[in-house]
């Protein structure tokens, strides 16, 4: 489940 970490960064970066 590495996509979860990516999605979190995307929301935080936005």
Swiss-Prot record:
Q: Which UniProt keywords apply?
A: Amidation, Amphibian defense peptide, Pyrrolidone carboxylic acid, Secreted
The cellular location(s) given in this protein's UniProt record come to: Secreted
Expression (tissue specificity): Expressed by the skin glands.
**InterPro entries attached to this UniProt entry:** Bombesin
Q: Positions modified as Methionine amide?
A: 14
Task: Please provide an example of a Pfam family that matches this protein in its UniProt record.
Answer: Bombesin
Q: Which domain of life is it from?
A: Eukaryota
Q: Which GO terms describe its biological process?
A: defense response; neuropeptide signaling pathway; regulation of insulin secretion
Q: Give the sites modified to Pyrrolidone carboxylic acid.
A: 1
Q: What GO cellular component entries does it have?
A: extracellular region
- PROSITE patterns (alphabetical): BOMBESIN
| Known role | Stimulates smooth muscle contraction. Role in induction of hypothermia, stimulation of DNA replication and release of many gastrointestinal hormones.
Query: In its UniProt entry, what is this protein called?
Result: Bombesin
Question: Where does this protein come from, organism-wise?
Answer: Bombina bombina (Fire-bellied toad)
Question: Source taxonomy lineage?
Answer: Eukaryota, Metazoa, Chordata, Craniata, Vertebrata
């Amino acid at each position: 489940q590495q996509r979860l970490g990516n999605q979190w960064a995307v929301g935080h970066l936005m």
